[in-house]
């Protein structure tokens, strides 16, 4: 991968207006506070405007209305944060994979390997696995029988796909995530729990990113489905038969119980718990550590839980909360007595 770009090249890549030397070389990205010569910074939040006078960055990504506050090389764009996201791909060494198959890899019968695939050391492919063009599998990854991995999809080290899992194009799966393990399905009986065998699979759309050590269980009968453009953080649990709509974002430590359906363009913050068999409509934002116990049919922001306070204050409030029912009954009695007078 190329490691340096002229400002002219970056301006063309970002469709940006260039102010400064078109031949000036950018070799890395950095924050306003830490940047030095030949590094590109950006400002997306006005709170950082105070650093424009002192930054040592070689050039900055700026909105046009910030241009007058900075005298150095500039790439002017409507949305600097989006531009930074796009240009970050040019300087990320982790996206480099060399085509080829490591001699320690095990390739099952009937596999179809697309053009330019990269298969690292100790990868195991079951029978009838299909890899799209440019797909890359990191060391120690295990792919079960009959899985499909789309073009340019990248799996980091020690990813596991159970039998029949399907991944779309341009996905990223980080280290240690597991897709297609059995959902938590058991029928109670007098003699103990009877396992319900999970006969569905997991189907993931295009441009999905799944964080490290996240688990997505296979469906009991229907497939668990993750639609296009979904982003999922580390350490998320998604149970069997769940459906996640397009472009929804799910932060770390969230757990979603079985058969819940979540709409498109939702944001679910960290450590949210969502019980099973619910429907959450499009455009819902759920704040951190919320417990969702019923379906949500209107877009908007939803919260639950008690925010942090000093321990002494929290203990007083907790004691009062335990007395809330009694206080409510006393208030009702007072209102009735006043009405009777």
UniProtKB/Swiss-Prot annotation:
It is an enzyme of class 2 (transferase). One of its GO terms (biological process) is lipid A biosynthetic process. One of its GO terms (cellular component) is membrane. It catalyses: a UDP-3-O-[(3R)-3-hydroxyacyl]-alpha-D-glucosamine + a (3R)-hydroxyacyl-[ACP] = a UDP-2-N,3-O-bis[(3R)-3-hydroxyacyl]-alpha-D-glucosamine + holo-[ACP] + H(+). It comes from the Bacteria. One of its GO terms (molecular function) is N-acyltransferase activity. CDD domains: LbH_LpxD. Keywords: Acyltransferase, Lipid A biosynthesis, Lipid biosynthesis, Lipid metabolism, Repeat, Transferase. Its EC number is 2.3.1.191. Pathway: Bacterial outer membrane biogenesis; LPS lipid A biosynthesis. InterPro entries: Hexapep, Hexapep_transf_CS, LpxD, Trimer_LpxA-like_sf, UDP_GlcNAc_AcTrfase_non-rep. SUPFAM superfamilies: Trimeric LpxA-like enzymes. Belongs to the transferase hexapeptide repeat family. LpxD subfamily. Catalyzes the N-acylation of UDP-3-O-acylglucosamine using 3-hydroxyacyl-ACP as the acyl donor. Is involved in the biosynthesis of lipid A, a phosphorylated glycolipid that anchors the lipopolysaccharide to the outer membrane of the cell. PANTHER family: UDP-3-O-ACYLGLUCOSAMINE N-ACYLTRANSFERASE, UDP-3-O-ACYLGLUCOSAMINE N-ACYLTRANSFERASE 1, MITOCHONDRIAL-RELATED. NCBIfam families: lipid_A_lpxD, PRK00892.1. This is UDP-3-O-acylglucosamine N-acyltransferase. It comes from Cellvibrio japonicus (strain Ueda107) (Pseudomonas fluorescens subsp. cellulosa).
């Amino acid at each position: 991968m190329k490691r340096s770009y002229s400002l002219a090249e970056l301006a063309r890549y970002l469709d940006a207006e260039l102010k400064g030397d078109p031949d000036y070389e950018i070799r890395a990205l950095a924050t306003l506070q830490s940047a030095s010569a030949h590094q590109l910074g950006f400002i997306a939040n006005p709170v950082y405007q105070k650093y424009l006078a002192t930054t040592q960055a070689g050039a900055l990504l700026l909105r046009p209305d910030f241009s007058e506050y900075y005298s150095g090389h500039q790439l002017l764009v409507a949305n600097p944060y989006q531009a930074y996201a796009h240009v970050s791909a040019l300087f990320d060494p982790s996206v480099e994979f060399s085509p080829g198959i490591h001699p320690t890899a095990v390739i099952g019968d009937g596999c179809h390997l697309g053009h330019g695939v990269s298969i690292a050391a100790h990868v195991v492919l079951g029978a009838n696995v299909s890899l799209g063009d440019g797909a890359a599998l990191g060391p120690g990854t295990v792919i079960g029988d009959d899985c499909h991995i789309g073009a340019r999809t990248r799996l980091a080290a020690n990813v596991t796909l159970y039998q029949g899992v399907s991944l779309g194009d341009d996905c990223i799966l980080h280290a240690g995530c597991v897709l297609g393990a059995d959902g938590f399905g058991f029928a109670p009986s007098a003699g103990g729990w009877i396992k319900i065998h999970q006969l569905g699979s997991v189907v993931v759309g295009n441009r999905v990113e799944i964080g490290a050590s996240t688990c997505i269980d296979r469906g009991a009968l229907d497939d668990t489905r993750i639609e296009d453009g979904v982003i999922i953080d580390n350490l998320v649990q998604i149970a069997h038969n769940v459906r996640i709509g397009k472009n929804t974002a799910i932060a770390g430590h969230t757990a979603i119980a079985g058969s819940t359906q979540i709409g498109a363009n939702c944001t679910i913050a960290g450590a949210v718990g969502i019980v099973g068999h619910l429907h959450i409509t499009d455009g819902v934002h759920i704040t951190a550590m919320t417990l969702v116990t019923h379906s949500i049919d209107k877009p908007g922001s939803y919260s639950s839980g008690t925010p942090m306070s000093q321990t002494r204050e929290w203990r007083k409030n907790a004691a009062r909360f335990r007395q809330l029912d009694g206080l409510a009954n006393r208030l009702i009695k007072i209102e009735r007595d006043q009405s009777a007078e």
